[in-house]
Amino acid sequence: MGLLFKQPEGTAGKAWPAILISGFVAFGGILFGYDTGTISGILAMPYWARTFSTGYRDSTGQLNVTSSQSSAIVSILSAGTFFGALGASPMGDIIGRRWGLIASNGIFVLGVVLQTIATSIPPFLAGRFFAGLGVGLISALVPLYQSETAPKWIRGFIVGAYQFAITVGLLLASVLNNATHHRNDSGSYRIPIAVQFAWSIILVGGMLILPETPRYLVKKDNIQAAARSLSKLRRLPEDHAAIREELAEIQANHSFEMSLGRSGYMECFQGNLLKRLVTGCLLQALQQLSGINFIMYYGTQFFKNSGFQNEFVITLITNCVNVGSTLPGLYAIDKWGRRPVLLTGAIGMAVSQLLVAVLGTTTTGQDSRGNIIVHDAAAQKAAIAFICLYIFFFAASWGPSAWVITGEIFPLKTRAKSLSMTTATNWLLNWALSFSTPYLVNYGDGNANLQSKIFFIWFGCCFLCIGFVHFMIYETKGLTLEEVDELYMEVDSARDSVKWQPRGVARGEKEAHGAETDFAVETAKGASEQQEVIGDAGRSL
C-alpha cells in the first residue's frame, strides 16, 4: 500500500485503521461475487442437470433443464437483489450501516441453506431468491459504509476494493466449480454452495467489532459516538483538533442540509439531486449492459455450447484476468481520476466486444441440430483473447468505478435512499439480462439463437458509455464527500468539473448553522473553545 499511496503531508493521524476497516467491509463483495459465479458452473454440471431435470433432454440426448428453467434459476437471484437493494435504505437509516450488514448476512445464510438441501427446482429457486435478497442489501450497504469511513485521498481505492472482492469471489467460485464438477454425486454442486457459510461467518465476525460510521452517527445526533468513531478511524484522541474539525465539517454540512427540509424519497427527484440520481442509475445500468455478467453467469455454458474444450478451465482463466485487472484500476481511479479511467475503459471495452462479435460470427456455423461447427480454431482462440481483453478494460475501469462514484455523489441526508436506488438499478438490469440471455443465445424453438452475435449488442452499449462519461460524469478525485456536494451545487456541466476547486459549501449559510451547533465533544477546554472550533471549521470550508 505504501508503495502506491502516500498520505498527504499535513494530514493528521493515521490512515491505515480506516483503510483496514473499510477494506475488511469490502469482504461483502466475496458473497456477491461467489454467489454470482457459482451458478455458471453448476448449470454445466452433469450430475446437477440430471438431478434437477424435469424430463427435458438437450440436443445431445442428455437430461437437462430447459432454457426457461435455466433463465428462472439464474435470474431469480437478481430479482432478490433488486428488492434487497431497495430495502437497504430503510435498514441502513433505521438500524445503522453496521447492524444492517449483520442482519443482511442472516437473510443470505437462509438462502444458502435452502440451496444446499434442495433436490428439485422450487426449493432451489427459493434459496436463490433469499440469497439474492441478502446480497442486494449487502451490495448497497458496503459502499455506503466504505464511503462514509474512508479518507478522501484514498476513497476511490477503498470503495473500489469492493469490486476487487467481487472478482475474488467469482474466481473462488470458478476454482470450486472446477474442483467438483467431475464428481458424480450431490457434492458436485453442494460443496461449492455450502462454502458460502464461511464467507458469511467471517463478515459477521468482523462487523461485530467494527465501529459505526461517523456520518450515520451525526445523522442520528449521537455526536459523542461520532467522535469516538472518528477517533478509531483516524487513530487520534477524541479531543484532537483534527477530529473536532472533521466532525465540525460533517455536522455543519448535515445541519445545512436539514435546514433545507426533511429528507424523503421525493427529495431525491428534485433539483440537482435528480441529476445525481440519474447519473448513478445510468452508470449502474451501463455497467450491466456492457455484457460482463453474460460472461460471469453464462460463460461456462456459452463456451461449452460454442465448441470450446475445457470450458471450466477457460472460465477459470477469465476470472483470473478479472481479479488481476481490478488492481491497476483501484490505483488509477485515485491517481488519474474518475473521468479518464471510465472513458478509457469504455473505448477499450467497445473495441474488444466488436472484435469478439466479428470473429465469433464469421468463423463458426451450426448443423441442423444446433451444434456449433468451428471453421477456424485459431480465430476462436483469438476470440477468447479479446474476451479477456474486454474483461481487463472492464475490471480496471467500470467495475470498481461504478461503486465508487455512486457511493460519493449523494449528500448525507439522501445518501442511503439514493444509493439503494442506484444499486437496485444495477440489479434490475442484472435480472433482465440474466433472464433474457438464454432466449437470446440458445438454439431451439422460441429462442433467438444469436450465439456470438450477442456481442454486437454489448458493443453498442459500450459505445454509448463513451458519450455518457463525457456528458454526465463529474470529476470527484481527492474531494471530501462534503466537497462533492459543493461541486454539484456550483458546477452545471460535468466537463467543467475537472477545473473546479473547493471553496466551502454555501459558506455563509453553513457558518450560520454551524455557529448554532452543539458538537458535544467533551474536552477540558470547555464550551467556549468548542464554539471557536466551529467558527474555524466553517471558515476552512
Curated annotation (Swiss-Prot):
Q: Which UniProt keywords apply?
A: Glycoprotein, Membrane, Transmembrane, Transmembrane helix, Transport
Indicate how the chain sits in the lipid bilayer.
Answer: Multi-pass membrane protein
Pfam families noted in UniProt: Sugar_tr
Q: Where in the cell is it found?
A: Membrane
The membrane-spanning stretches of this chain are 15-35, 72-92, 106-126, 129-149, 156-176, 191-211, 277-297, 313-333, 340-360, 384-404, 418-440, 454-474
Entry keyword annotation includes Zinc:
no
Q: Which CDD domains does the entry mention?
A: MFS_HXT (cd17356)
Disulfide bond sites: none
* Any Gene Ontology CC annotation: membrane
Q: Name one GO molecular function term.
A: carbohydrate:proton symporter activity
Q: Which residues are glycosylated?
A: N64, N178, N184, N253
Report the principal subcellular site: membrane
> Is-annotated flag, keyword Transmembrane?
yes
| Organism domain of life | Eukaryota
Q: Which family does it belong to?
A: Belongs to the major facilitator superfamily. Sugar transporter (TC 2.A.1.1) family.
Write down what this protein is called: Major facilitator-type transporter ecdD
Source organism phylogeny: Eukaryota, Fungi, Dikarya, Ascomycota, Pezizomycotina
